[in-house]
Amino acid sequence: LEILKPIWTKIPETASRVRNRIELVLDAAKATGLREGENPARWRGHLDKLLPKRSKVSKVRHHPALPWTEASRFMKELAQQTGLAYRALEMTILTCCRTSEVLGAQWSEIDLKTDTWTIPAERMKADKEHRVPITAQLKSLLEQLPRVDNSPYLFPGQKKGQPLSNMSMLMGLRRMGYSHITVHGFRSTFRDWAGE
């Protein structure tokens, strides 16, 4: 509590991550017999009674998202669209990855033998290598993507040696009539669906 109190209201996002990491370390210590008792960094039933909720400390801004109940219909509509931006959007939704991770995806990261997409640490927000399973639907999408000469990218842009612009998917959403949602909002759509 003494570690978190000074930063809880000043830098709530960082404080929340620090609390989470402390909780994980103490849980691991308990699991390996290095400590006993309750975890003092646990949020539910402990710190939630001692510290204000993050929503009370700072305004959390959510990205406008598609309701999960409309996702199936949207995916069918998306499949009918032509162009790389739509395929990039489809891959973003299928993998729950960030826009930058999908647009920066390179053929060298894709292993269709093991059905794994390995995103290198330097392209991840958390600076850790991330492995994404390639589902049958994603594999089909990847197999249909055109290979552009001398481009390492799955979704090459107009400028030589550059990936597709990060605005391309958002513009695709707008052309489809979905200007009220964002690409990043699909991560929230997935979270809501998984929570049901």
Model-derived features: positions:
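Active-site/catalytic core of tyrosine-dependent DNA strand-transfer enzymes
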Residues: 11, 25, 65-72, 114, ...
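A short, basic/aromatic helix-end/turn motif that makes direct DNA contacts
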Residues: 104-110, 195-196
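Basic, Lys/Arg- and aromatic-enriched nucleic-acid-binding interface segment
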Residues: 6-23, 31-105, 113, 124-128, ...
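General beta-strand recognition
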Residues: 1, 116-118
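Active-site catalytic microenvironments for nucleophilic, acid-base chemistry
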Residues: 6, 28, 32, 175, ...
